[in-house]
């Protein structure tokens, strides 16, 4: 018969059958030959007891099997195994309310679990609070295991008894953390429980100076709705967030109502039994209303160090905004030498954007000649405006201007911002076009636009007419211009034209040309040769009279060259037609 390691734990007898592993609740037992799920293996691994094995070797082997069925090292990598371990520990440290809900979501990684918790915290109407306790031994549990025997033996007082007993002892730190009240003799083997018991004893000594927060019977809860009474040593173990959480108030699960301090006037009426105890209001009473504030600094039940800590927190709060002192503007501040009429005289001058930009580099210290300060009275405001604008303001009522205003000298409009004033000046300048082009007479509103326009007139014009000497930027413009010179009436002098007209009147109508030849109305001005069509004349001039002009386009089939690529392509098409005919004839 195997022997047990611990004298208090006995190995099962040979006649007795070993205890069967119970399946987790809500899951059917796996059929024989089928591997259990990883979640089932994890729960069996965590719930395994030494008494379920016949000996230490069998217990170790059983733990190896259950751990392998949970972590699956043959499938998962090291990173995935670590992810499963961290996920299990994260779920174990969650509060009971959040833990059960997150486990039901079956997260596969820590990021999914964190996302589920964050989504639950953001859910409206359910302000889950993160209950941060003092350090206690980590017990990994899935949330379905039964309570310990000591916890099951703790009596649960009904709500009615707790509501009636107003002089009950305050809740201690050990009771808040769920630790049972044991005598020191039973805590010799557990050092953590010894520390908790010592904290409980110190807390009992301070109960004479501390009172508890009593709630109505319908809202009584053993942990959530009570102010925790910690000793000075307990308070030193908590961080500032936990100190504020436990010391001021605890937000419950079903109501998100907090009672900030420093508002004694908004406290509700208290009955005779609750004169010195603040009451937490119901959620339905505070919907749509401003939350009242309750101050705990004047309560005699608080420890001195608690009062000091709360005062420090209140000092760190954002103070109310105080009204800035208004600067008094002297009424006799006028631009341009202190004369109130100098403004009207300066408005008659021409205002440019450059003057406005240079006049107000720093708007607080320097003001341009057209930036006026706010005057003392409405009459003084109207006194600084032009007559046209003054009459309109008198008819419409009081002039509402800011401390700093810009007045347009042309129309009298007032602008508060300098940017709008400059934009207004630019719009007026665009409407007026004082700059005229000396070549074509076009009008421009800006001198820079005129300079750019003049550059277009001075651009290079390589195409020059041989008859009159005019230059053109495009060859098409030159060809259209040559049509004027190709007309015979315009080529002849005025006297010859008059003489020819008189001769035609004397002789009568001309006879048609011999051999049925058409009339040649296009004559070359250089050689006198006449052509029937103007394109024939243009070809004649390009071949015979423009030989000195550069011909960069050379034909690859012959020695001819052309001035334009279009003529070269048309010439090469003739070569291609001839070659195609020769190729067809060769077959």
Swiss-Prot record:
Entry's Gene Ontology molecular function annotations: DNA binding; DNA-binding transcription factor activity, RNA polymerase II-specific; RNA polymerase II cis-regulatory region sequence-specific DNA binding; zinc ion binding
Keywords attached to this entry: Activator, DNA-binding, Isopeptide bond, Metal-binding, Nucleus, Phosphoprotein, Repeat, Repressor, Transcription, Transcription regulation, Ubl conjugation, Zinc, Zinc-finger
Start and end residues of each KRAB domain: 221-291
First-listed, main subcellular location of the protein, grouped into a coarse class: nucleus
Name of the molecule in the record: Zinc finger protein 496
Entry's family note: Belongs to the krueppel C2H2-type zinc-finger protein family.
Entry text on domains: The C2H2-type zinc finger 1, also named C2HR, mediates the interaction with NSD1.
Subunit structure: Interacts (via zinc-fingers) with JARID2. Interacts with NSD1.
Chain intervals annotated as zinc finger (C2H2-type): 406-428, 435-457, 463-485, 522-545, 553-575
Residues joined by cross-link Glycyl lysine isopeptide (Lys-Gly) (interchain with G-Cter in SUMO2): 13, 403, 496
Pfam families, A to Z: KRAB, SCAN, zf-C2H2
Entry annotated with the keyword Membrane: no
CDD domains assigned to the protein according to its UniProt record, in alphabetical order: KRAB_A-box, SCAN
Phosphoserine carried by residues: 185, 299
PROSITE patterns, alphabetized: KRAB, SCAN_BOX, ZINC_FINGER_C2H2_1, ZINC_FINGER_C2H2_2
UniProt organism field: Homo sapiens (Human)
Domain SCAN box: 42-124
PANTHER family, sorted: ZINC FINGER AND SCAN DOMAIN-CONTAINING, ZINC FINGER PROTEIN 496
GO CC entries: nucleus
Ranges where the record places region Disordered: 1-40, 260-282, 358-399, 488-513
Amino acid composition bias (Polar residues), ranges on this chain: 389-399
GO biological process terms, semicolon-separated: positive regulation of DNA-templated transcription; regulation of transcription by RNA polymerase II
Function: DNA-binding transcription factor that can both act as an activator and a repressor.
